[in-house]
Amino acid sequence: DGLVGYANSIGLSKEGFPIISYHHLNAGDLKLAYCENIDCSSAKIQLLDWAGDFGYFTDIAVGNSGKVYISYLDRKNGDLRVIRCLDYKCGRAQINVIDKGTGKAGYVGEYNSIDITKQGHPVIGYFDNNFNNLKLAICEDTDCYRSVIKHVDTEGMVGEYLDLTLDNDTDMPILAYQDRTNMQVKLIRCSDLYCDNYESSIIDDVAKRGGDISIFQDTSNTLYISYYDFNLNYLKLAICKDSNCNENKTIIKLIEAKILPGIFYSWNSLIVNNSGNVLISFYDMNTNNFGIVYCDDEVCEDKEIINIDKIGKIGTYASMISDSNGRIFISYYDSSRGSLKVAQCENNKCN
């Protein structure tokens, strides 16, 4: 009961069913919904961490072996934590404190984003509110008992709205994030797993700030980055054809926020379907609808706006994923009912 799904992240289990980590706002708990079938008409709910304020920021990743990992913020102590599920439904779980904060006076772990290397080691990018830095935690084993903590970007207030992925070929971290000091959306491509060496690029000068960032690398290694431009009040898409996103970059304005500047098309999530089309979920705060931008061509000059759910205030904190068969799954928060929802698209266009 209460406000569940306020923050959520979706993955796919070893069986190919949706699995969602989420925050129960009233209770302050971190929970997991394990869908027991492909359409999630039946789900097992697991209580993962409680008696505090857990999971306000959370992300989930499933390794090649099917092991499930969940990164999240402990707001009571200000710590970054990682859960490793000990069975595929996460009925048993191991909790590790990765980086310690100083309570509510100084969080580490906001905007955390997790991915798993091909060797099964979790890598977590996150914002350190103590130092206002972008940080990276690299687990040195699959249990995440031991980890190396790196301050990756320390120039100004950097690391909010972070999203992380691992390069398809090199398995090295790629991080997209906000540089609030310089009012830019930035990209870092690590040259090694520990990010001792990296290339840094400015994706966009956004004059105020760029928020709600989502990153995806397709099978041809093209990078796609969606974000909200709070200056121009646009949901935007950056397409990077070169490795450092400097020489061959395209910026597309997708939708303009005409009614409520600054907060209109927020909480976006991005994937590329198995036909090579970009899909970006968004919340329309004017209509309170939840929808998708579907790109009909490579640079999204031709696009369609598709409504997914439009009864109530729905679609915040969305997370989207597709499986090897092209099926698309989206978890999102329905603030009218205070509930977590899952949508499964019946085709790769979600219409």
Regions found by a protein language model. Name each.
Residues D1-N351:
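Extracellular, repeat-based ectodomains that mediate carbohydrate processing or recognition
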